[in-house]
Each structure stands twice: as structure tokens, then as C-alpha cells.
Swiss-Prot record:
Its EC number is 2.5.1.61. It comes from Limosilactobacillus reuteri (strain DSM 20016). The porphobilinogen subunits are added to the dipyrromethane group. The gene is hemC. This is Porphobilinogen deaminase. Coiled coil: none annotated. Binds 1 dipyrromethane group covalently. Monomer. One of its GO terms (cellular component) is cytoplasm.
Length: 305
């Protein structure tokens, strides 16, 4: 048995930080194994200035990495779960979901804001996410959404270089990179914007038939996180979700039970349909909520009208 394991990762600061966190957890359990990172450049990395919806949605950050897994050049890969397509290649599996951190978004600004109402009329907000855009505009239709891409440092700089009143970021990325936000104000958006499916959770992908790696990954799987994100992904699968229209989905534990919130919206914020606090301890809830939202969609949200 070889004592070396090759781990696939994107090259960005956040991707590397997440991969190193996973490796550190495994090294504590398997001190005799040498973990080596292999960086893989994805379509999403190459096309930094084009919206994700235009270059293929979620899969643009994982396809090349999955190709390496299928070719056997890496043993497993660490992804942000929200980047992973709802249906995997037949020979691959998500082998572990480490404990989830915050799934929520936040608004980072130079202004001291206590709520979204404190933003000036017509404020310029940077985000490249249709999910964030649709929900934000449903609350403040006067806001001007400015598409921005790039790593977290790049996006923070754009607050000044593009005269933005704020940008929306995932709390998880800020936490994992330990970003210094002392010169900014941060508004928690938990009560305003439903998270993306899988946000705040890492996913470790491997070959379905690689029993050695799968047993290894079992050791760092968090059962509650795994259950919750599987409910969310079932919801997304039923909706055919990528990045082409706003979808929010969040399963969470509260008072001893699992609850699920699901949402679809139009990109302009005119229509928002959601179900919240749906008990999700039994299987099939993700599909059920998706079907309920589809039945209520009289506005052509899913068709992209």
C-alpha cells in the first residue's frame, strides 16, 4: 500500500486554504501518510471576467478536477460544495463533508450599516451571483447591481476602484482565509438572503470504487452536515440548478430536528417564491419542496422569463 495520497485543488488562496484544512485533519488521524497537493486550473479560473452563467454555471470550477480523478492522477479533491454540480459523473462520489461553517452571506462596506435600509438610494452593490441579486432586489429594487468576479482580495479592492457602496461575500470564505476586515463594516445578511445550496460546506470527491480513500475520508465526515447538504442537493437536482436563475436552499438543525428552507426568484427580484421551516428529518423533503415551488411558479422563473 502506498503511503502517498495526491489531493486535487484549485490554485486560489481560498481553495488552497480549504485543502490544507482537510489535509491537516487527515494528518492527525493518518500520521504515516504523505499528502501532496496537485493544483488544477479550471475553466472558471481561466475565464475570470465572464459571468459564471455564461461559461457553464457551477461546473466550471470542478470539471477539470473531476477529469483528473477519472484519469487516476489524483486520489481525491477538495471543493467548495456550492461549486459542485447536483449530478456527479457516474464513477465519482462525494466521500466526505467536513463540519460546515457559516452558510450565510454578508455585505462588506466602507459605510457603517445596521440594515439594508441604511444603504443610500441607488447604491452600487457588487456581486456576480443571481441568487444574491434576485433576493437583494426583492428588498431594495432601487439598488444597482454591479457584476464582479475574482478572488476575495480582488473583490474587496473593487469597493474603492469601482466606487461600490458594498459587496456581498460568503462568510465562510472570509473565516477560512482569516481576512482582516478592520477597515470595513460587515453586515450579516442571514435575515435577508437565503444561502446557496451547500454554502459553507466543503465536499471531498473521490472515485466510487476506491475503498481505501473512501474509508479514510469517512473519518472526517460530519454526519449532520452531510445530511443537511444532501437535502439541499436533492432540492437543487429537482430544480435542475446551476447559476442560471436564483435558487436558495438551506437545511439546518434546530431544537432536535432538521428544518429546510427553499427559494426560487427572478433575477430582477420581482418574484420570490419560498417555503421555510419545513421539517426534513425524513427522506424526500428536498424534492417535495422543489415540487411545491415549481407548482407555485406562475411567473416563468424556472423558464427564465
Amino acid at each position: 500500500m502506498t503511503n502517498k495520497v495526491i489531493v486535487g485543488s484549485r490554485k486560489s488562496k481560498l481553495a488552497m486554504a480549504q485543502t490544507e484544512l482537510v489535509i491537516a485533519s487527515l494528518e492527525k488521524i493518518f500520521p504515516d501518510i504523505k499528502f501532496e497537493i496537485k493544483n488544477v486550473i479550471t475553466e472558471g479560473d481561466r475565464n475570470r471576467h465572464v459571468s459564471l452563467a455564461k461559461i457553464g454555471g457551477k461546473g466550471v470550477f470542478v470539471k477539470e478536477i473531476e477529469d483528473e480523478l477519472k484519469d487516476g492522477t489524483i486520489d481525491f479533491a477538495v471543493h467548495s460544495l456550492k461549486d459542485v454540480m447536483p449530478i456527479l459523473p457516474e464513477e465519482l462520489v462525494l466521500g466526505a463533508f467536513p463540519k460546515r461553517v457559516s452558510p450565510y452571506d454578508c455585505l462588506v462596506s466602507r459605510k457603517n450599516l445596521s440594515s439594508l435600509n441604511d444603504l443610500p438610494k441607488g447604491a452600487r452593490i457588487g456581486t456576480n451571483s443571481l441568487r444574491r441579486q434576485g433576493q437583494l432586489l426583492s428588498i431594495r429594487p432601487d439598488l444597482k447591481i454591479i457584476p464582479i468576479r475574482g478572488n476575495i482580495d480582488t473583490r474587496l479592492r473593487k469597493i474603492d476602484t469601482e466606487a461600490l457602496d458594498g459587496i456581498i461575500l460568503a462568510e465562510a470564505g472570509l473565516t477560512r482565509l482569516n481576512i482582516d476586515l478592520s477597515s470595513y463594516h460587515v453586515l450579516d445578511l442571514q435575515n435577508y438572503i437565503m444561502p446557496a445550496v451547500g454554502q459553507g460546506c466543503l465536499a471531498i470527491e473521490c472515485r466510487k470504487n476506491d475503498t481505501r480513500i473512501r474509508k479514510m475520508l469517512d473519518q472526517i465526515n460530519d454526519e449532520e452536515s452531510a445530511y443537511c447538504v444532501q437535502v439541499e442537493r436533492e432540492f437543487m437536482r429537482e430544480l435542475g440548478g446551476s447559476c442560471n436563475f436564483p435558487i436558495g436552499g438551506h437545511a439546518y438543525a434546530k431544537n432536535g430536528q432538521i428544518l429546510f428552507d427553499g427559494l426560487i426568484a427572478s433575477p430582477n427580484g420581482e418574484h420570490v417564491i419560498k417555503e421555510t421551516k419545513i421539517p426534513a428529518n425524513n427522506s424526500g423533503v428536498g424534492k417535495k419542496v422543489a415540487d411545491q415551488l415549481l407548482a407555485k411558479d406562475k411567473f416563468g422563473i424556472i423558464e427564465g422569463e
